Design a protein with these regions (language model features):
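Acidic, glycine/proline-rich Ca2+-coordinating loop motifs
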Residues: 24-633
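Bacterial N-terminal signal peptides
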Residues: 12-22
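Bacterial N-terminal signal peptides that target proteins for export
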Residues: 2-12
Length: 633
């Protein structure tokens, strides 16, 4: 990453920090009244000093992060440091590195156990050529699956800023010579030093703070796609990264921002609008699960289960080989005829409804759906919310963040004119007038469809109560209060989630504030009874950001809501009336918060022991290798 890129990043941090301190939106930053009292000027000066310190610290982390890749390669070589990474260390290093294998291990399940290594804090001084770290950890490893270091936090250790005290995290997975598998998590205090005239930072102190390893007899899951999908064309479609190809072409200048056709009036690499999804369905009622995959740029895939561990692509056979630009799908017997039908969400086109007619899916959107289905559908959920025995539909919608800077003269984003009706634009404009870019960012309206029988749908009379006008990633239903009807939880990005109690026939009541729900970048939600007490609990996917934790911790007078935005996923224990947040980073909390930048985490009982486990996908954006920069936070 270039110095210019560093400065751009620092400027973004500066703007965000000012916004956090002042509690204003981006539009309000810079509109401060210059006629301040002397006391206010002093306060502002201190704030500016604090912000400058934060920016300098974050810039240094940005510049040092690529150096950690050399340590990552050392892990792969099972030598820390190796000949390449040894240059990261000073000629003389103060080291606290005496570690010993766990004296006791805690049995987990199915042959897995974990244990903390003994760590001796005694400091020794050694020369760079003689430095050997974590030798005992590597001694039993046959080969490494993956391993990495990352910055957790850091700060300058002296006024001259020639020393930088950092906390590093390390994690990895390896196969041992014994055949067992091992994972580790470690924390290291590393001091980086430079002289007054130079900018070459080197590690002068290394202290292993903690090291935990998990052992298992074999992996819980093994990648078998190559064996399960024999058809080469289907395999290529399932594994190809066409979005990466388009991204590379765009940044190389071979493809325009506005691509041909109306499907992609704007194209951005870090898209949140077009995202693949997976739906499970027994398409042929043979008792085996089949897989439907929505695609961004090619036709969708229907992988039929051959009952022998393999799948065949048969979308054409069922009429489901539709062109991509799809983001969500859900199967259900919406006409009560005994076979699954399909609702399909499409971000840059209106949603579609396919009826299963003797094994052939027909688009019956115009005939059976009363209103126009919305654009920008991000996810779909189904429940019989009114207790009439028919499945109803909730559509979550999410406006394209990539177009947030494409504004029209009246300050509304272009997508609002392209994808909303005039009436919807008017309602959206009202939401814009009350917006906060981080805490209350508006989006398109969600939609509730009521099943009127024979597979037909109309707008529910409660629709206005659930529209919300937020950036809604996912909604899901569960009878939280045990009154016989399903309640609705909506995970919203850039704002508070919404928990809507179903009081049918008296509509929905928003009980978010009274239920104990915390603010977060909501990107998924799942219901289950994790502690088997007969009451449903809730797992909400949010964002855990090391950078966000660092910045919000160092800014004084911060709006407390901002601190919550980077604290990770939330596990709530339900009591039938309210939620209690039981997850967090403290030792007393359930350790399910630090799941990275999480998307759609789900409860599932992986080991069939009767207790719900959690799977939480995470990540944000990985650039194609041909255009990627040497940076990853």
């Amino acid at each position: 990453m270039s110095v210019q890129s560093h400065k751009i990043k620092a400027f973004e941090i500066l703007v965000l920090s000012i916004a956090i301190v002042s509690g204003c939106s981006e539009a309000e930053v810079g509109q401060r009244n210059t006629a301040q009292t002397e006391q206010q000027s002093i306060a502002v000066s201190k704030q500016e000093q604090s912000i400058e310190s934060i920016v300098s610290s974050e810039e240094l982390i940005l510049s040092l992060t690529p150096k950690l890749k050399k340590l990552n390669k050392s892990l792969a070589n099972l030598r820390l440091p190796d000949d390449v990474s040894r240059g990261l260390f000073s000629d003389l290093i103060e080291v606290s590195n005496r570690i010993s294998p766990p004296a006791d291990r805690i049995d987990l399940y199915q042959g897995f156990s974990c244990g903390n290594w003994g760590v001796n804090g005694l400091a020794e001084t050694t020369s760079s050529p003689d430095l050997v770290l974590w030798e005992q950890l590597f001694s039993g490893i046959k080969y490494l699956n993956h391993g990495k270091f990352n910055f957790v936090r850091g700060s300058f250790a002296n006024p001259e800023r020639t020393e930088y005290q950092s906390l590093l995290g390390s994690s990895g997975s390896a196969v041992l010579a014994s055949g067992q598998i091992m994972g580790w998590n470690a924390k290291v205090e590393a001091v980086w030093s430079r002289d007054l005239t130079g900018d070459q930072w080197k590690i002068s102190k290394w202290k292993t703070k903690s090291l935990e390893t998990t052992l298992g007899e074999e992996p819980i899951f093994v990648e078998v796609l190559d064996d399960a999908l024999k058809d080469k064309m289907a395999w290529r479609l399932a594994t190809s990264a066409l979005h990466d190809q388009k991204t590379s072409g765009l940044y190389a200048g071979t493809q325009p921002e506005r691509l041909e056709g109306d499907e992609y009036p704007f194209f951005f690499a870090e898209t949140t609008l077009e995202h693949p999804s997976v739906a499970i369905v027994d398409i042929d009622s043979d008792g085996f699960d089949d897989i439907f995959v929505t695609m961004r740029h090619t036709q969708n895939l229907l992988l039929r289960n051959n009952q022998d561990g393999t799948f065949e692509e048969c979308g054409v056979r069922y009429g489901l080989d539709k062109t991509g630009n799809c983001s969500a799908a859900i199967f259900g017997d919406f006409d009560n005829d005994g076979d699954p039908d399909l609702f399909l969400g499409r971000p840059r086109h209106r949603g579609q409804y396919f009826v299963n007619e003797s094994g052939n899916f027909k688009d019956r959107t115009r005939e059976l759906i009363g209103p126009d289905l919305p654009f920008m559908i991000s996810s779909i959920s189904t429940a019989d919310y009114n207790g009439d025995g028919l499945l109803d539909i909730h559509l979550s919608t999410y406006g394209p963040l990539e177009n947030v800077h494409h504004f029209t003269a009246d300050k509304a984003p272009i997508w609002s004119q392209q994808y909303l009706t005039e009436e919807e634009q008017s309602a959206f404009a009202k939401e814009l007038s009350e917006t906060h870019v981080y805490l209350r960012r508006p989006g398109p309206a969600n939609m509730l469809l009521v099943n009127t029988g024979d597979g037909a749908f109309d707008v529910a009379r409660e629709n206005e109560q659930v529209q919300l006008w937020r950036q809604s990633f996912q909604a899901t239903w569960s009878d939280f209060d045990n009154d016989g009807d399903p309640d609705l939880y909506v995970a919203n990005d850039y704002g508070s989630d919404n928990f809507l109690r179903n009081d049918f026939p008296n509509g929905f009541t928003d009980i978010t504030e009274d239920s104990g729900i915390a603010i977060g970048f909501g990107m998924g939600v799942s219901w289950n009874d994790y502690n088997n007490d007969g009451l449903v609990d809730l797992y909400v996917s949010n964002m855990f950001s090391k950078a966000g934790q660092r910045i919000t911790a160092d800014v004084s007078k911060i709006d407390p809501r901002f601190k919550k935005l980077a604290t990770g996923n939330y596990l709530y224990r339900g009591n039938g009336e309210k939620f209690e947040l039981v997850s967090g980073t403290s030792l007393e909390s359930m350790q399910v918060a630090q799941a990275g930048w999480a998307w759609g985490g789900q409860f599932v009982d992986f080991n069939n022991d009767g207790f719900s486990d959690i799977y939480s996908p995470n990540g944000y954006y990985t650039a194609p290798s041909d255009i990627a920069v040497d940076m990853d936070l």
